[in-house]
Structure formats: structure tokens, C-alpha cells
């Protein structure tokens, strides 16, 4: 994360007032809360082995609570400092910091592990001070997921590059097989990584390259050796993501599928059309809501894709959420499109970016189809970035 940005105290206090909260209580122990580290602009690699609290009240000066052997832990932040040593002194200081507050946010949520970084024991401790603890999920989005104009442009550049990588990969497969040579999942993976790096981009993991039953494994990892060959009659799934290497750059993430040959099986074509239609339905619903000012949540869009797939008879084969937040990390800290694995009831807010990537996975039939696009909330509508988008199953002629 780019933690060189200034800490936004005035904006945070304005948002706390808008939400009707008395404050936002941050906490960490041994790096358990990377969201807090990002919002509070910790330097990367900063060591910490003791508990600290940082309280931002809706009005007034923030409060820092740090241990006696790490008194400088929060020195980069504004506010008064209290140093504790014993657990009893920590409890007393925390009680004092929270006096006058009745309702505070923490990085916690009942059914959303992406937000819930504070352990249950610490939440209980805070509640024992007579304070109601509510989730900071909506606040996290505001400070962690809204793109600057420069960040949006970095995403566009990444999207254009990986869209080109998709075309390069499919051309490579066709050229190699037509020449009578072999090509494996690992060959494709290595080629994509090379193209990403030579273009001035980076990724945090190999792309997903899956043939047949491997395509039906949503997070298949290509082995370093003895990966599957790509042959005529195969289905190929290619999921690729990247960002620019400079700090603050935003990821792009897309998935395309191809058939090696000219005549895909009818069921494969049907599955692709269902997945594509579910993707488009979610994008259209997002645009409808965003353009009218209607509030819509991540879980709501998950239900849209899931409904289309279930109605077509493939509901049991859609085994993951519809999409995730995109930011400086491939899985960002904004609202995810999820009412399946978790319950993400956070609103989709202007200036944020997320994926829409429904899929149907039938390993027994050696079919796995996913279609993934990136969607930006412009404030007036939903922009599906990185065109052209996949409308038909690609046929790689041999």
C-alpha cells in the first residue's frame, strides 16, 4: 500500500459526524490489522510487538495509547499520548480515552472477515467500558477504496495491458499448435508473467491458467513442472491481473475462456452463455442503480448473478462470490459482491472499483467457465473498464 499519503484527520472526523458515531477506535497487536496500518499511514516494515490503541473522536484531539517499550509506535500521528506498562494500566487508560463516548466504530464485523480484523477478546474489552462497538466497514471503504483520478488512470493502463496479454496468449497457443509443437499451462503462465513485467507492470501471483478439469478449479495453481498440455478439443481458462510498479497503482483483473478448435461442445457453449448473461445482468443492474442514485450493496449484485445462473439450472456449480474490491491490492478493502461466502452488506460507493466474475465449474464434465470484468462506479453510472469484453467463447483454430 502507498502509505506516503497524509493522514486525513479532518475528513475522518467529518465522516464520523455524518455516521452519528462518537469515534473510531483503531487497535493492533503484532500486525494483525493491515487495514489500520494503511489508514493510519504506517511505514512499511515497521516493527511492533505490543498492543496499541488510537482513538479518533468525532470532535477534538485524537488519543494514542502505547506500551512503555514501544513509546514511539504512533509518533507519526497527531494526538495526545498515554504510555502503559501493565495490563491494569492499559485498562484504566482505555477507560479514560473512551469516557464520554457511547458508540464507536472498530475494524470488526459479525459476518465479514475482510473487515473483521480486531479479535473478539479486544472487542469484549472495549464493550466492558460501557461502549457500543459497531462495524467500521463503511468507513473503511471511504478511506481505503475510493480512487484518485491518477489511480483510475493507472487502472486503465493496467487493464489495457492485460487485455493485450489475453490476445497474445491465445495467439501463442494457436501458433504453437498449428506448428505442431506442444504448449503447457506452465508455458502460458511464464509467457504471461514475462509480458506483464516487460510492459512495466507487476502481479502478486502467477495468473490462473487451467485446461479442462483445471479450468473447473476456480483457484487452480499451475505447477512449476509437469503441468498439463493444451491440446485440440480442450477448454482453456485464463485469469490475469496486474498493476503498474509505482506506489499507489491500482490493479486490473480479467478472465477469458477459449476452446481449442472450431466446434465447442453444445453444453460448453450453453454454460458460457449463462455465465456471460449473469455477468452482464450484474453490470446492468449496477449501472441502473448508480445512474439513478439508488443505494445498492455488494450482496445485492451477488444475488443478481446467482439468480441468473440458478434459473438456468447451474446454481450448485457457482461456488464462489461474484466479485471483489479492486485497489492497490488485488483483493481490496471495499465492498465485495458477496452474499454467498460472507455477507457483505456495504454500499457500493462512487469512486470505487470492483470485479464481476461469475463462474460455473463442473469438474466431472471437464468444464469450468468464468467471465470477469472490472467495474468503476463513476457517480453517474457503472463503467465496465478494459474493453473489448468477452461476448462469445473464443475459438482458437488449429
Model-derived features: positions:
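Active-site neighborhoods and metal-handling regions in enzymes and metal-associated proteins
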Residues: 1-398
Amino acid at each position: 500500500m502507498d502509505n506516503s499519503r497524509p493522514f486525513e484527520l479532518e475528513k475522518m472526523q467529518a465522516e464520523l459526524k455524518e455516521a452519528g458515531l462518537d469515534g473510531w477506535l483503531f487497535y493492533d497487536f503484532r500486525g494483525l490489522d493491515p487495514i489500520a496500518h494503511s489508514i493510519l499511514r504506517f511505514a512499511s516494515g515497521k516493527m511492533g510487538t505490543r498492543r496499541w490503541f488510537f482513538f479518533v473522536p468525532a470532535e477534538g484531539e485524537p488519543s494514542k495509547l502505547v506500551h512503555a517499550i514501544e513509546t514511539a509506535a504512533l509518533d507519526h500521528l497527531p494526538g495526545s499520548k498515554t504510555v502503559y506498562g501493565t495490563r491494569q494500566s492499559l485498562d484504566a487508560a482505555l477507560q479514560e480515552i473512551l469516557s464520554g463516548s457511547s458508540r464507536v466504530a472498530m475494524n470488526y464485523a459479525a459476518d465479514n472477515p475482510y473487515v473483521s480484523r480486531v479479535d473478539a477478546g479486544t472487542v469484549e474489552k472495549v464493550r466492558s467500558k460501557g461502549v457500543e462497538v459497531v462495524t467500521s466497514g463503511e468507513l473503511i471503504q471511504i478511506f481505503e477504496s475510493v480512487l484518485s483520478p491518477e489511480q483510475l488512470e493507472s487502472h486503465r493502463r493496467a487493464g489495457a495491458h492485460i487485455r493485450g496479454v489475453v490476445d497474445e496468449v491465445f495467439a501463442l497457443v494457436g501458433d504453437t499448435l498449428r506448428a505442431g509443437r506442444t504448449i503447457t499451462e506452465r508455458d502460458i503462465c511464464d509467457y504471461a508473467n514475462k509480458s506483464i513485467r516487460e510492459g512495466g507492470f507487476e502481479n502478486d501471483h502467477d495468473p490462473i491458467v487451467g485446461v479442462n478439469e483445471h479450468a473447473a478449479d476456480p483457484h487452480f495453481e499451475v505447477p512449476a513442472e509437469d503441468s498439463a498440455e493444451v491440446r485440440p478439443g480442450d477448454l482453456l481458462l485464463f485469469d490475469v491481473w496486474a498493476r503498474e510498479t509505482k506506489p499507489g497503482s491500482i490493479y486490473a483483473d480479467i478472465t477469458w475462456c477459449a476452446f481449442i478448435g472450431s466446434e465447442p461442445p453444445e453444453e460448453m457453449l450453453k454454460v458460457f452463455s449463462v455465465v456471460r448473461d449473469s455477468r452482464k445482468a450484474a453490470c446492468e443492474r449496477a449501472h441502473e442503480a448508480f445512474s439513478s442514485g439508488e443505494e445498492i450493496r455488494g450482496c445485492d449484485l451477488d444475488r443478481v448473478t446467482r439468480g441468473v445462473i440458478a434459473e438456468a439450472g447451474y446454481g450448485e456449480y457457482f461456488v464462489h462470490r461474484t466479485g471483489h474490491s479492486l485497489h492497490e491490492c488485488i483483493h481490496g478493502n471495499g465492498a465485495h459482491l458477496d452474499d454467498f461466502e460472507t455477507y457483505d452488506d456495504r454500499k457500493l460507493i462512487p469512486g470505487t472499483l470492483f470485479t464481476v466474475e461469475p463462474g460455473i465449474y463442473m469438474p466431472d464434465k471437464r468444464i469450468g467457465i468464468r467471465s470477469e470484468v472490472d467495474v468503476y462506479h463513476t457517480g453517474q453510472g457503472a463503467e465496465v473498464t478494459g474493453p473489448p469484453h468477452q461476448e462469445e467463447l473464443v475459438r482458437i483454430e488449429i
